[in-house]
Design a protein with these regions (language model features):
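Conserved acetyl-CoA-binding loop-helix of GNAT-fold acetyltransferases
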Residues: 43, 49-66, 82-90
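GNAT-family acyltransferases
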Residues: 1-46, 63, 67, 73, ...
């Protein structure tokens, strides 16, 4: 499913690995050209709360705006996913909508967070 979207330049996927253990995948992050759903990620529990996903989000958000030249990034997240919300808040994103969404583990109340390229670049100055 991912490879055709990558070939069409509609999705971009990366794995997260520690420099000290480059053969071990500890997480994943992706970007996609979908309405209200441009970025998603997961990180294994042992590596959470260390700033690793915050760092990865910085890099891929730069890529979204500076390399791919999109004007807005929207990231959905389950309301219960407080850690994911904190990353969006740290990045200067704002909550723009709530809705129910389907996830691998079921349907849950969700939030959609947004930041524009202009806002992103202003934060980096």
């Amino acid at each position: 499913m991912a490879l055709p979207a990558v070939e069409r330049r509609e999705a971009w996927h990366w794995t997260l690995r520690l420099k000290s253990a480059p053969d071990q995948i500890i997480g994943s992050i992706d970007l996609r050209k979908k309405e209200n759903d441009n970025r998603g990620f997961w990180l294994g529990l042992p590596w959470q709360r260390q700033g690793l996903m915050t760092e990865a989000c910085q890099v891929v958000t730069d890529f979204w705006f500076d390399t791919l030249d999109f004007s807005v990034l929207r990231a959905p997240k389950a309301v219960a996913n407080v850690a994911s919300r904190r990353i969006s808040e740290k990045q200067g994103m704002r909550l723009i909508a709530t809705e129910d969404r389907d996830y691998v583990s079921g349907r849950f109340p969700s939030e959609i967070w947004e930041i524009t390229a202009q806002e992103w670049r202003a934060r980096k100055r």
